[in-house]
Amino acid sequence: MADQVTTVLVCAYPTVETADSDFETLMSQVKGKQVGIQAAILISQDADGEVAVQRTGDNLGRKGMGWGGGVGFLVGLAAPPLLAATAVGAAGGAIVGKFADRRIQSGLGDTIGEALKPGTAVVIAMMDEDQQMGVERALGSALGRSAVETDKTGDAALKDSLAEAMGKFSPDRTVLPIPDRNFGGAVDRTIGRSVLDWSMIPGPKAPDDAPNVLLVLIDDAGFGGPGTFGGGINTPTLDRVKDMGLTYNRFHVTAVCSPTRAALLTGRNHHRVGMGGIAEFPGPYPGYTGQLPRSCAPFPRVLAENGYVTGGFGKWHLTPGQAFGPAGPFQRWPLAWGFNHFWGFLSGASGQYDPVITQDNTTIGVPQGKDGESYFFPDDLTDKSIEWLHGVRAQNKEKPWFLYYSTGCSHAPHHVPKEWADKYKGKFDDGWDAYRQRTFERQIELGIVPPDTELTERPEAYAAWDSLSEAEKTLYRRQMEVFAGFSENADYNVGRLIDAVDEIGELDNTIVIYIWGDNGASMEGTFTGSFNETTFFNGVVLEPAEQLEIIERFGGVEALGSEHTAPHYAAPWAHANNTPFQWGKQMASHLGGTRDPMVIAWPNRIEAGGSIRSQFTHAIDIGPTILELVGLPEAEMVDGIEQQPMDGTSFAYTLADADADERHTVQYFENYGSRAIYKDGWWACAKLDKLPWDFTPETLNRFGPGNYNPEEDVWELYYLPDDFSQANNLADQQPEKLEELKEVFW
């Protein structure tokens, strides 16, 4: 197959003004995708023979991009002998020595020299051969033009020489902050005799064409909840992102909020970064301090130090409880994790009508609704995110951004306006058993689970739906209607944010990573759920009839989800939302607690269609993947402190290859004694002999210091390539494999 031909087009103009007008037309058409180029520059020569680069542009229609990539290549073509070092500053001067011979041998120098005369200007554009006619039309005011063609092999030597010449202007991005640049020019007694170095001015710059990144995280949601993964909740935005890109059906999290968030933002295992439990309850042992080690810089910090602007919005849950408030210490707050701006709540849960809002390093209190309307956090969260994006673009048209959007949904309390819950009236009347079966069948139909997958059994502790009284069914069905409406509203607001990215024309070059859950669906509502989740925290269990009697004071069961309630649903609904797996939140031992939906899109690079990827992936893989996709290395030194390598493995290799061998082959899981080890498809696990929500004094004493012996826990064994849902325990058949994996865990 013949090499694709590259054309370098040189257009001569009688004045700089005429050239500038055509250059602007070209860049506008490139940005509008009417024509494609690799790079373009405008060079002028005044009456005294002084030569200077006036304008530069890249393949995205961005102007003033400096000397990187194709722009630097064109500067190199023109630099010797037409451009002296004093004309283009240190960057051009660096190119002259190494690049000159290659450029002259190519014959391109003669073409440029003939076009550029005193008092005139030239526009030089580089493009693929099939774009030449469109570029010539855009540069239609030129008095003359000539084109030189070279194939990819022919210009490789030129570009290699340019890259070597430009090397001294490429910072070491493994050391952060990037050290101040040394002045690359020369200072004489006058400006005219001095060598300029404009490269010192902009500060850290992201790699050429670096994409934006939008990372969305839903809270306390399960594998079998969203319609995109076969569940009963409408998720059109999750569908939209899936259809633009890829679906990952073996993405894993830790089984609890804070540990997953720490793993997600650092690319490291949760114990390595001090978050073995939730942030509110740090402990006096390594791995449980609730404090991020300075040797584990989060990837938002890496982005921010490399030319990105970073914003975090929504639920945080990574600040220890004792650090809340005006005394800090603020190195435990979001800005210290690499965010230039934060708006949201620091705690692990909040009412959606009355959150305590923190902005940057200041707690600003509980917002009020406008015009007599109730305040609703999900709407304001999205408004604030969009306002930030607009503000970033109003100041800087080109700087790439990273936006972390973390909802309070679907963590209890399940707050949502009644009209959203009413969309699901009657849809769950047949109960959680029917929901699981229906979801499982849709998952097989969609290809989310393999056709030979087994639906795991309902735990004996959970009541069968058909065994319930009418009073119980009345309460429980409304609990699920409220939860579904709450969840769909969150997806709707994610859609508003993606629409805003599209409206500013940046969706094509934005990586969208949408994760439906930081752990499995929450079973903390106990067997009965509650009209007010604080009953759980205080060890109070109210029977359904008692709950119905109490909520009659506030408008009856239809009031669930309103400002007068703080509801959570019954644990069997969480189990249903984790279909087809066992258990849920807090249970690191089983996939119901650790496997969640993820979809990824990047229109500029990922082929649309929702193709499924089944390689093992984990929250710690997100950071390494983002860094690889945007063209940045891991940091090795931050603030003078040597960094621990990220534990995660980039899954960028899966974007274009559904059948690629998985590279993340070993991973441990552990939360509150519930634990598992994954290795080469095998999964060994053990859980405490208790229900996740059982914090009674008797149970706490049974598992307290001196009483609990982890060696007595019963381990299970699964081979996931043949058992997607973790349904068949092989511990008795393969005891040697189980012992081998237990040793790997410890």
Residue spans for each PLM region:
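Accessory carbohydrate-binding/adhesion or oligomerization-edge regions at the termini
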Residues: W746
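Cytosol/matrix-facing juxtamembrane amphipathic
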Residues: D3-S28, Q34-Q45, A100-K168
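Formylglycine-dependent sulfatase
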Residues: F169-E711, W715-E716, F724-E743
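Switch/connector loops and helix/strand junctions flanking conserved nucleotide-binding motifs
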Residues: A52, Q132-V135, M523
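Short, low-complexity, glycine-enriched hydrophobic/amphipathic alpha-helices that associate
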Residues: G57-R103
